[in-house]
Amino acid sequence: MSNLKEIKRKIKSVYNTQKTTNAMKLVSTAKLKKAEEAAKRSKIYAQKIDEILSEISVQINKIVHNEDDVRLFLFHKKEQIKTVDLIFITADKGLCGGFNIKTLKTVSEMLKEYEAKNINIRLRAIGKTGIEYFNFQKIELLEKYFHLSSSPDYEKACEVIHAAVDDFLNGNTDEVILVHNGYKNMITQELKINHLIPVEPKSIEQTHNSLLELEPEGTELLEDLIKTYFEYNMYYALIDSLAAEHSARMQAMDNATNNAKARVKQLNLAYNKARQESITTELIEIISGVESMK
């Protein structure tokens, strides 16, 4: 009888877990739809900025005539790389499957790779999971940003990237790389590594005899465009990461709900079997008692 009570207690516990994970799945699904729409809209704008800046980068020396202009430094890769700044995004919350693992594994591998080349790598962490992971590993973080990955904010994104750009222009770092797990579709996330600084022309069709004309005067537009390019790439990465996070959490909670359902089914079978055995045992005892009285 005690065995039946124990099984019944387990069924109730797993069933409650099933209801919780199913509710979390529904919440993530609703949040995903909103985040997915925001990511798709932002992606179009980010791609267009990339295309324009890539086109300009081909003829940058024609636009900026002063070789000492700081804007040129943002396009020219240094011959010797001594320091690299790595900005990476993870989730502030858990229960999202392997979403954070891809990013953390990639960052850890990059750390080893650069250290093997005697290149100093500085980490700028966005998201509680990544911050706690590297704190546990006793790896120093240059910057820590909490609550930004779960609530993307344009002004805060600007703050993050402006600090990195300033360090590049001041000679404190030679390259800035952005790593995040991005949204591909409702069931797939895609790890993205973006070499933000210096600006690298994207793989689009371009020629040195470009017909692109800049209005207003080239250098004025270039300054605003570069600023927008850095800011929006940072902001888009946050939005893209959040959509991927909701997608991963929706899948994780769906899997957890299905596993809980399967476990409840197993426990119900075990309960029915134990109950049947208990009834059979009682019947045998009754029959045996009657036989002994004859």
Swiss-Prot record:
Keyword Cell membrane belongs to the record: yes
GO MF term (any one): proton-transporting ATP synthase activity, rotational mechanism
Pfam families (UniProt xref): ATP-synt
Gene3D superfamilies from the UniProt entry: 3.40.1380.10, ATP synthase, gamma subunit, helix hairpin domain
Main location: membrane
UniProt superkingdom: Bacteria
Topology in the lipid bilayer: Peripheral membrane protein
Keywords: ATP synthesis, Cell inner membrane, Cell membrane, CF(1), Hydrogen ion transport, Ion transport, Membrane, Transport
Subcellular location as annotated: Cell inner membrane
Family (UniProt): Belongs to the ATPase gamma chain family.
Subunit text: F-type ATPases have 2 components, CF(1) - the catalytic core - and CF(0) - the membrane proton channel. CF(1) has five subunits: alpha(3), beta(3), gamma(1), delta(1), epsilon(1). CF(0) has three main subunits: a, b and c.
Biological function: Produces ATP from ADP in the presence of a proton gradient across the membrane. The gamma chain is believed to be important in regulating ATPase activity and the flow of protons through the CF(0) complex.
Protein name: ATP synthase gamma chain
Organism listed in the record: Campylobacter jejuni subsp. jejuni serotype O:23/36 (strain 81-176)
Taxon lineage: Bacteria, Pseudomonadati, Campylobacterota, Epsilonproteobacteria, Campylobacterales
